[in-house]
C-alpha cells in the first residue's frame, strides 16, 4: 500500500509505517502525478483535493489533519467512491489558548479589564463552542451566533447584527462556506465592519475569507480605536502587507498549532484509516506525546485573579512571540513572502496546551479554583 502525505504532518512514521510505503511532499506542491499511484492520501488545509488532483489515481481514502473541510471536494469523493475523514476538534484547545493570549495582550494595550467586556463568538462548533464554555466558566458575558445550531437546537443564540452592535470583542470560528443557506465567505464585509462598536476587538482564527480583508484594511486605516487580530488571511500564504501592519497581532495561521493539537489530528485520521481498513489500532497517541516541560504552577490564595489569569495562560502560550516572528518575515517580494509564511509553519516550535496544566493552590481560594477549572487546569 502506498501512502502519499504532506511532509508537515507530524508522527507519520509512528502512526502509518505499518501500512506500507510513505512518500512525503510539500502540501502546496501535491499534484496529480504525485498521487497517481497512491492508495491513501493524507493532507492538511493547504492542499486542494478535488477531481483535478485525484481523477485517474488509485486513491480510495483521504485523511485531512484539520477541523475544516473546505479544501476537500466532498461531492467528487461521493461520486468516485472515495472515503474520507477529517479531525474535528483536534486543535480546538490550541485555538482557545491563542484567543485568550490575544485578549490579554489587547487588554494591556487598552488598559481595560477583561471581565467587563462583552464577548461575541460567531460559530459555536468544536472551537467556538469550547471558547464559549471557557468564557462562561470565567464568568464573562458571552453572546453566541450560530444559525445552524440555532435551527437544529433552538436555544439562546443571537443574530450577527446583535453581535456587531452589542459586543466589545468578536471572535470568529466559522467554517468557510461559499454557498448554501448560511454562507460565510466575507461574512464580515464593509457593511458589517462599519457596525463595530467603538474600541471593538476583532479576532479571526477561522478562515481568511470569512473577513473581507480589503474592507478590514480600509476600516483600520480609518478607525484607530479598533484592534484586529488575524491568524488567517485571504490568499495565504500571500499576505496583504498593509493589513498586517495595521493589525495589533498578526500570525501565520498557527492558532491551532499546539503540539497536542497537531499530533491529535494525525491520531484522528489514523483511527479513521484503521476503521476503513477494518484493522485494530496498534498505536496510541498517549504513548507518543512527550511530557509537558512545565510540570506545575503554584499560586498563593491571595493571588490577584487578573494576574493569575495572565500567568496561567502565558505559561503555555504568548502570541506576541509569533507576532514578532511573523512581522520579521514579511517581505515585498511575493515569492519570498509565501515561502516565509510556510517556513514559519513548518518550523513552528513545540507549544503545549493549558488543558491539564497542574496547579497547586496554597490556601483556600474558591475564585482562583474556579478560574483554574474554567481554563482547563487541574488542581493538585
Swiss-Prot record:
Keywords: Cytoplasm, NAD, Oxidoreductase, Pyridoxine biosynthesis
Enzyme Commission code: 1.1.1.290
The protein's role, per its UniProt record: Catalyzes the oxidation of erythronate-4-phosphate to 3-hydroxy-2-oxo-4-phosphonooxybutanoate.
Organism of origin: Pseudomonas putida (strain ATCC 47054 / DSM 6125 / CFBP 8728 / NCIMB 11950 / KT2440)
Enzyme class: oxidoreductase
Protein name, entry field: Erythronate-4-phosphate dehydrogenase
Catalytic activity: 4-phospho-D-erythronate + NAD(+) = (R)-3-hydroxy-2-oxo-4-phosphooxybutanoate + NADH + H(+)
Assigned GO CC terms: cytosol
PANTHER family for the chain: FORMATE DEHYDROGENASE 1
Binding site for NAD(+): 146, 174, 205-207, 231, 256
Protein family: Belongs to the D-isomer specific 2-hydroxyacid dehydrogenase family. PdxB subfamily.
Main location: cytoplasm
Subcellular location: Cytoplasm
Biological or metabolic pathway of the protein: Cofactor biosynthesis; pyridoxine 5'-phosphate biosynthesis; pyridoxine 5'-phosphate from D-erythrose 4-phosphate: step 2/5
UniProt superkingdom: Bacteria
Pfam families, sorted: 2-Hacid_dh, 2-Hacid_dh_C, DUF3410
Molecular function terms, GO-annotated: 4-phosphoerythronate dehydrogenase activity; NAD binding; protein dimerization activity
GO process annotations (BP): 'de novo' pyridoxal 5'-phosphate biosynthetic process; pyridoxine biosynthetic process
Designated gene of the protein: pdxB
NCBIfam families: PRK00257.1 (NF001309)
Binding site for substrate: 45, 66, 257
Amino acid at each position: 500500500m502506498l501512502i502519499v502525505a504532506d511532509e508537515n504532518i507530524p508522527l507519520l512514521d509512528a502512526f502509518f509505517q505499518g501500512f506500507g510505503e510513505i512518500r512525503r511532499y510539500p502540501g502546496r506542491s501535491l499534484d496529480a502525478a504525485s498521487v497517481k499511484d497512491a492508495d491513501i492520501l493524507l493532507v492538511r488545509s493547504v492542499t486542494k483535493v478535488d477531481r483535478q488532483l485525484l481523477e485517474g489515481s488509485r486513491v480510495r481514502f483521504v485523511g485531512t489533519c484539520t477541523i475544516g473541510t473546505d479544501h476537500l471536494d466532498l461531492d467528487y469523493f461521493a461520486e468516485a467512491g472515495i472515503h474520507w475523514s477529517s479531525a474535528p476538534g483536534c486543535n480546538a484547545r490550541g485555538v482557545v489558548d491563542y484567543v485568550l493570549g490575544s485578549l490579554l495582550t489587547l487588554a494591556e494595550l487598552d488598559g481595560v479589564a477583561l471581565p467587563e467586556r462583552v464577548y461575541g463568538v460567531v460559530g459555536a462548533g468544536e472551537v467556538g463552542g469550547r471558547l464559549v464554555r471557557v468564557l462562561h466558566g470565567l464568568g464573562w458575558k458571552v453572546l453566541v451566533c450560530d444559525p445552524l445550531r440555532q435551527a437544529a437546537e433552538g436555544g439562546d443564540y443571537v443574530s450577527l447584527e446583535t453581535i456587531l452592535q452589542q459586543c466589545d470583542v468578536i471572535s470568529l470560528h466559522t467554517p468557510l462556506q461559499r454557498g448554501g443557506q448560511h454562507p460565510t465567505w466575507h461574512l464580515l464585509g464593509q457593511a458589517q465592519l462599519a457596525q463595530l462598536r467603538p474600541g471593538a476587538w476583532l479576532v479571526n482564527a477561522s478562515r481568511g475569507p470569512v473577513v473581507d480583508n480589503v474592507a478590514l484594511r480600509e476600516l483600520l486605516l480609518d478607525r484607530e480605536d479598533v484592534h484586529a487580530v488575524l491568524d488567517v488571511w485571504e490568499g495565504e500564504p500571500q499576505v496583504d502587507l498593509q493589513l498586517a501592519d495595521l493589525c495589533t497581532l498578526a500570525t501565520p495561521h498557527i492558532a491551532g498549532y499546539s503540539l497536542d493539537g497537531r499530533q491529535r489530528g494525525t491520531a484522528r485520521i489514523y483511527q479513521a484509516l484503521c476503521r476503513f481498513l477494518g484493522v485494530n489500532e496498534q498505536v496510541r497517541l498517549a504513548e507518543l506525546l512527550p511530557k509537558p516541560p512545565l510540570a506545575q504552577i503554584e499560586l498563593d490564595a491571595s493571588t490577584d485573579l487578573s494576574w493569575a489569569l495572565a500567568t496561567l495562560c502565558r505559561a503555555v502560550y504568548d502570541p506576541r512571540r509569533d507576532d514578532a516572528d511573523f512581522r520579521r518575515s514579511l517581505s515585498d517580494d511575493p515569492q519570498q513572502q509565501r515561502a516565509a509564511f510556510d517556513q514559519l509553519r513548518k518550523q513552528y516550535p513545540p507549544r503545549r496546551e493549558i488543558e491539564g496544566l497542574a496547579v497547586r493552590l496554597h490556601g483556600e481560594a474558591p475564585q482562583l479554583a474556579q478560574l483554574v477549572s474554567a481554563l482547563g487546569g487541574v488542581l493538585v
